[in-house]
Amino acid sequence: MAKDSPSPLGASPKKPGCSSPAAAVLENQRRELEKLRAELEAERAGWRAERRRFAARERQLREEAERERRQLADRLRSKWEAQRSRELRQLQEEMQREREAEIRQLLRWKEAEQRQLQQLLHRERDGVVRQARELQRQLAEELVNRGHCSRPGASEVSAAQCRCRLQEVLAQLRWQTDGEQAARIRYLQAALEVERQLFLKYILAHFRGHPALSGSPDPQAVHSLEEPLPQTSSGSCHAPKPACQLGSLDSLSAEVGVRSRSLGLVSSACSSSPDGLLSTHASSLDCFAPACSRSLDSTRSLPKASKSEERPSSPDTSTPGSRRLSPPPSPLPPPPPPSAHRKLSNPRGGEGSESQPCEVLTPSPPGLGHHELIKLNWLLAKALWVLARRCYTLQAENKQLRRAGCPYQADEKVKRLKVKRAELTGLARRLADRARKLQETNLRAVSAPIPGESCAGLELCQVFARQRARDLSEQASAPLAKDKQIEELRQECHLLQARVASGPCSDLHTGRGGPCTQWLNVRDLDRLQRESQREVLRLQRQLMLQQGNGGAWPEAGGQSATCEEVRRQMLALERELDQRRRECQELGAQAAPARRRGEEAETQLQAALLKNAWLAEENGRLQAKTDWVRKVEAENSEVRGHLGRACQERDASGLIAEQLLQQAARGQDRQQQLQRDPQKALCDLHPSWKEIQALQCRPGHPPEQPWETSQMPESQVKGSRRPKFHARPEDYAVSQPNRDIQEKREASLEESPVALGESASVPQVSETVPASQPLSKKTSSQSNSSSEGSMWATVPSSPTLDRDTASEVDDLEPDSVSLALEMGGSAAPAAPKLKIFMAQYNYNPFEGPNDHPEGELPLTAGDYIYIFGDMDEDGFYEGELEDGRRGLVPSNFVEQIPDSYIPGCLPAKSPDLGPSQLPAGQDEALEEDSLLSGKAQGVVDRGLCQMVRVGSKTEVATEILDTKTEACQLGLLQSMGKQGLSRPLLGTKGVLRMAPMQLHLQNVTATSANITWVYSSHRHPHVVYLDDREHALTPAGVSCYTFQGLCPGTHYRARVEVRLPRDLLQVYWGTMSSTVTFDTLLAGPPYPPLDVLVERHASPGVLVVSWLPVTIDSAGSSNGVQVTGYAVYADGLKVCEVADATAGSTLLEFSQLQVPLTWQKVSVRTMSLCGESLDSVPAQIPEDFFMCHRWPETPPFSYTCGDPSTYRVTFPVCPQKLSLAPPSAKASPHNPGSCGEPQAKFLEAFFEEPPRRQSPVSNLGSEGECPSSGAGSQAQELAEAWEGCRKDLLFQKSPQNHRPPSVSDQPGEKENCSQHMGTSKSPAPGFIHLRTECGPRKEPCQEKAALERVLRQKQDAQGFTPPQLGASQQYASDFHNVLKEEQEALCLDLWGTERREERREPEPHSRQGQALGVKRGCQLHEPSSALCPAPSAKVIKMPRGGPQQLGTGANTPARVFVALSDYNPLVMSANLKAAEEELVFQKRQLLRVWGSQDTHDFYLSECNRQVGNIPGRLVAEMEVGTEQTDRRWRSPAQGNLPSVAHLEDFQGLTIPQGSSLVLQGNSKRLPLWTPKIMIAALDYDPGDGQMGGQGKGRLALRAGDVVMVYGPMDDQGFYYGELGGHRGLVPAHLLDHMSLHGH
C-alpha cells in the first residue's frame, strides 16, 4: 500500500485523530452487525431444529395415515364381503324358491304319469284275471262234462287223458301269466325306473339352493331304508310270482345304491368352490347310466354291492377343510309299527320308508313312486342341510376376520392421531402469532430514536430491521406452508382410501391387490418427501445467499461510497417510504368509504330488485283487473242493449195487451149479444123444425142430398177467391126474418175470413149439462162420408190462407148428435153426454186381467180422452183418443176434466143453433182441435176464443177479432197438434210458445235439488242445464229432474230447454227455455242409520231396537252437522230418543207404545242441531210380540181429570169410512150427571178456523173435480186453464208412492198457541186417538217436518189407488186431517163469548144425534175418580138436520165447505187485481161460507179469521141434513161424493155416566189373525152366470167398497171377509190394501 493511500473510511492513517469518530461509528456498526449475525445464526439453528422436529412429526403423521388407510381398507373390505355374502344368500334363497316350485311342478307331472301307468297296469291285470277265470270256467265245465271219469266203470286211459288235458291248460295258463304278462310288467317297471332316474338327474343337475334346515335325521328312519331288503328277499318265497318280485327288489336295491352315491357326490360338490360346482354335478350324474342298466337285471348280488358302495361314500359328505358335522334330523314322520309292514292289502299303509317292501309285493304299484319321492326328498333335504352348515361356517369365519382386522386399539390410535393433529395445528398457529409479535417489536425498537446516534446509523438500522422482518416472515411462513402440505397429504390419503375401496383391487384374493395398493401409497409418499426435502434445501440456500449479501455489502459500501451518498440515499428512501406510507394511508382512508358506499349500493340494488319484482306483480294484477273491467263493461253494454230491447218489447207487449183487453171487452159484449141472438133464433126455428120433422116422417120420403155439393164441382171450389155460404131453398122459406142477419155475416166474412168451428145445435138443452160441454170427435172415415149424411157443403178458402191448405177441401159430417131433422124422428131426442177425461196413469190392456184387451184403449198419463155416455156396469167408459182410436176406457185410470176447462179453447157462453159452413182448409184443423157438437171453436189468442155460431141453415153468426194472424196460424196449429203439443199452449198470437212453464224447485238440500216444470209437449225431450252447461237429457213425457252431487252453500242457475226435431226448428218459437236460480243449503241433514233391527228381549214386553250408528268424523258431525243422538219412530210417531251420537241400540217397553197392537214397522232417525235425518230402512216388528199381550179394554173416549196437562180423545172410527156412529137407543141426548153442557152438533168444532200453521199437504192425483160454471168471467176461465196445466204436471208423474210438489207454506204462522194437539194414528179397526198436550208448542220447522213425515207415510202407503175408486179413502184421510186440525183449534178460544153462547144453543130444526164431547182439562182443578167433562168444554156434535147456522150474526146463515186442493191467489188467480180480496187455503181445510156464488163463481168465506172470496170450483160443501140418507158429502161440481164413514161398521157408541163414550158390543180377546181393511178395485158379481153354481157364499163387490178381511188367502185365491153386515168369500185379486196410518 502507498503511504498516501487513504483508509477505507476516507481518513488518512497518518492522521488518526481526524478519523477516530468515523472509526468508532464503524466499529459500533461492525459490532452490531456481528451481534445481529450471531442472533441470526441462533435463529437459524432454532429453525433447523424446528424443521427437523417438523420432519419427524411429518413422518409420524404419514405412518399414522398409512395405518389408518390400511384399517379403513380392511373395514371396507369386510363390509364389501358381508354385503356380497348377503347378496349371495339372497340369490341362493331365490334360486331355492324357484327350484322348489319347479320340483313341485315336476312332481305333479310325474304323479300324473304314474297314475296313467297305474291305470294301464290295472287294466292289463284285469284282462289277465278275466282270461284266467275264463280258463278256469272252461276247465271246470270240461271236468263236469267228463263225467265218465268218475264212474266206477271208467278206464284208466280216459282218466290219464283228462289229467294230461288239465296239465296242458295249467301250463298254458302259467305261460300266459308268468311269461308274456310278467315280462310286460317287468318292462314297464324298468321303464318307470328309468324315468325316475332321469328325473332325479334333472333335479340334481339344476339344483343350486342352500336351505337352512334344523334337526337331525332319525337313525331309525335311516336304518329303515336298508333293513327291509333282507326281509323282502327272505319272505319272497311265499309269493306266487317270484320273478316279478325279484325284478322289483333288484331295481329297488340298485336305486338305493345309486342314491347313496349321489348323496355323497352332492355333499362333496356343495362343499367345494362355486367354480367347480357344475363339473362336480356332471361327474356325479354320469354314474346313473350303469345304475339304470343294472336295475333291469334280476340278480341278488346288487343289494350287497349297493351297501358296500354306500359305506365308502359316506365320508364324502363333508369337505376336507371343514370340520365334520352331525347329520340333521329328517323332516319325515316316524316309521309305522312293524305290524303295518305285514299288511299286504294296504298299499299305502304308512308314509314312512319301511312300508315300501310291502308295497312292492302287492300287485298295485302306486306306493312305489310315493316312497321313492319321499326318499329323494330326504336326500335333497340332507344335501341342503350340508350346504346350510357350510354357509353358517363361512359366516362365522367372516365375522372372526372382521373382528381381527378392526381391533379396539386401532380406534384408540385413530383418536390419538386426531388429537395430535389438533395440537400441531395449534402449535403452528401460535408460532405464526409469535413471529408477528416479534416483527412488531423489532419495528418499534428500530423506529425508537437512539440518543447520540447519527442519522446514517438510524437509516442502516431501519434497513436491517426491515430485512430481518422479511426474513422472519419468510421463516414463519415456512411452517404454515408445511402445515398446508400436511393437510394436502391427508386429503390425498383419504382420496386414495376411497379409490382403494371402490377400485377393482379389493377382490377376494387380497394377496394381489393389497401389495399393489400399499406400493402405490408408499411411492406417492416418497415423492412428496423428496419434494419437501428439495424445498428445505432451497430455503437454506436462499438464507445463505441473504447472509452472504448482508456481510459483503457494508464492506463494499465502505470502500465505494461515502457517507454523504449513503445519507442521501437514506433520506431519499425515507422520503419515498413516507410518501408511500401516506399514500397507503390515504388509499386506506379512501377504501373504507368506498367499501361502505359499495355495501350501501349493493343494499340499494337488492331493494331495487325487490321493488321491481313487486311492481311487476302489481302490474300483472292491475292488467288482469283492467281486462276484467273491460270484459264487464262489454257485458254491461250487451246487457243494456238486451235490456233496451226487452223494454221495447215490453212496451210493445203492453200496448198489444191493452188492445187485446179492449178487444176482449168488445168481444165479450158481442158475445153476450150473440148469446141472445141464438135464443131468439131458436124460437123462430122451432116451428120450422117441426115442419121439417113432419116432412121427414112421411113414408117414402127420399133422403135429401147436400144441395151445394151436388151443384158446385171441385174445380169451382178451388177456383173461387171468396167464401160462399149457400142456403137451401126451404131455409129461405122458413126463416125469412133472419135473412138480413145472414147477409151481414156474409159481408163480414168477405172482408176478413176466419176459421169457423163445426157445431151442432140441440133444441132443448138440459140445465144440468152446461152448454159449453164438448161432445164427440169425428174420425177420418166419418169425416169423409159427408156426401151421404151431410146437409150442408164446404166452401172455398179465403185469399189470405196458404195455397196448400186452401186447396184442401173436405166435407164435414154432422155429429152423431145433430138436429132433429137429421135424426129422422118425430121428436128431438136428448143429446148424449160428452165429457173430456184425462188419463192419470199409464195403462196397457194386454197386461191386465181382462179377457178382451183388444177392445180397450192403451192410455198414457196426461192424454185427453173424449168419453161418450155414462160408465157401464163393468166400470168402463166408451171413449176416443186424440188420434181417433175408439174403445173402452177403465174408469179407475182416468179423471174427468172440469166442464169449465177444455184444452185448446175456452168455453162458449151460449149454445149453438146449428151446423156451419167453413172456409176450405180449416175443417181439418177443426177436426183435430174442436170436435164439439154443442159449440164451435177457433184459435186461442191470449185466452180469447173465436166462437162461430150458426143460427140455422139460413143464418150464420160469426165473430171475428183478428183476421190475418189467425188465418195464417191455423195450418201451423194443425201440424203442431199432430206433433203432440198440448192444446192450451198451441194457440198464441204472433209467436208460439214451446218453453217449459212453471219451473220451480223442490227438496233443495246441501247436495241435491229437484226441479219440476210443465212441458208444452209430452212428445219432445228436454235438456237440463246447470250453470249454462248441459247436465242431462230427460226423455219425452218427463217433467222433473234431480241434481245430485252439488256443493253445499253454492249458488246455481238451472235452465230447462225443449229439444225439437229438425222439421219443427224452421218455425220461430220464441223462447224455448226457462231458467231458475237457487242456493243449496249449507250442510245437513245428517245421514240416517243403517241396518235397523227389531228383536224381542229376554224380558217379556220389551223390544230391542238396534242399528248401525251413522259414520261421523273427528268433530262428531255427519254431512256437516253435529250429531246429538237418535230418535226411534214407530209408524211415523216418535216413541223414544237416545242422546248419544254413538249409540247402537235401545229398549222399548210395551207401555211406551201408544197403540202397539197395530204398529208394524220401526225406523230410526239421526238427530242433530239442525234437525233430524230421513227415515232409515224400516224394520218389521216380530209378529209374535203382540200375541203375548192383550190390549187393555179402555173406553173409546176418555179423559183423566187428575192430570190437567194432557187429555186424550179416543173414539172408534172405521179406518175406511171415518164417520160418526148412528143414533143409538142407549145414547141419551142430555146427561144430568154431566157438568151442565148441552149437547151440540159434532161438526160445530169443525166450523171454527183459528189461526194455525199451514202444513204442506201434497196434492194427490185424486183431487176433487172442479164444478162447472155456467156463466163465468174471462179471468175465471184463465184460472181454470192454469189449474189444468198444474194438474198436467201432477198427473205426469208416477202414481205409485209419489209425492207431487206441494205449495210452499204461507207466511204469517201464529206462534201464540199455548197448547199442542197431536194425533197418533193407528191401523186398528175402529180407533183414532187424538192427544192434546198443554205446554209450549214445538218449533215451526220441527212441527212442519213431523207433519210432513206423517202425511208422506200415509200417502206412500196408499200406493196405487185409482182416483175414481179411492175417493172414499181420500175423503177418509181428508176427514182424518180435518179432525187433527180441529183438535188443535181446541187449545184456543178465538171465537169469543158470543159465539160460544151461540154454539151452546141447539138448532131447533136439527135432530139430536150421537155426540162426542171433547173436554178441556186445562181448566179443571179438582181431581175426580169419574170421567167427567170440564165445565167449559167444547162439544163436538154431528148435526143430522139442515145445514149448520153459523156466522158473524144471528141472522146470517153459514155453510161449511172443505177445500179440494191448495189455492194461492197470488200465483193461481186469473185476475191479479182481485187477488188481494181472495183467501189462501189448503187442501182439506174447512171454510165457513155465507150466501151463494157470485157471477164469477166465487163464495164469500172466512178462513184463518180473514174474510174474502174463494173459488167455488176448488171447494165442496159438507151437508149432513136429514134428506141425505146415505150420509155423503155433496160437492157442487160432482154431486154426491163417496161416503166419509158409515156408522153401521161400528158396534155402537153410548154415553155413560159422566159423558164419556164407551164401546158397545163384544169385548172378547182379539183374534190371533189381525183383520185387514181392503178396498175393491173392480166390480164383482158372483151371480152373473159365468160362475155357474160356484157363486154361492161369495159377496158382490162394487168398485170402492171397503171390505174387512179375516185370515189369510185360501188355496183358490179368496179371502173370507165382511161387507155391509154380510160375510162370505171375496176374490183376492180384486182387492187392494188400504190404511190410514201409513202402512
Swiss-Prot record:
Subcellular location: Cytoplasm, Cytoskeleton
An individual GO BP term: fertilization
Bias-annotated ranges (Pro residues): 326-339
Domain Fibronectin type-III: 995-1083, 1088-1184
All copies of domain SH3, residue ranges: 832-899, 1452-1520, 1569-1636
Keyword Coiled coil assigned: yes
UniProt superkingdom: Eukaryota
Biased composition (Polar residues): 707-718, 761-775, 1293-1305
Disordered: annotated span: 1-22, 215-240, 295-364, 697-811, 1251-1273, 1292-1330
Compositional bias segments (type: Low complexity): 776-790
Segments forming a coiled coil: 21-143, 409-442, 480-619
Main localisation: cytoplasm
Key words, A-Z: Coiled coil, Cytoplasm, Cytoskeleton, Differentiation, Repeat, SH3 domain, Spermatogenesis
GO cellular component, one term: cytoskeleton
Molecular function per GO: benzodiazepine receptor binding
Subunit and partners: Interacts with LRGUK (via guanylate kinase-like domain). Interacts (via C-terminus) with HOOK1 (via coiled-coil region).
Family label: Belongs to the RIMBP family.
Described function: Probable component of the manchette, a microtubule-based structure which plays a key role in sperm head morphogenesis during late stages of sperm development.
PANTHER family: RIM BINDING PROTEIN-RELATED (PTHR14234), RIMS-BINDING PROTEIN 3A-RELATED (PTHR14234:SF21)
Record protein name field: RIMS-binding protein 3A
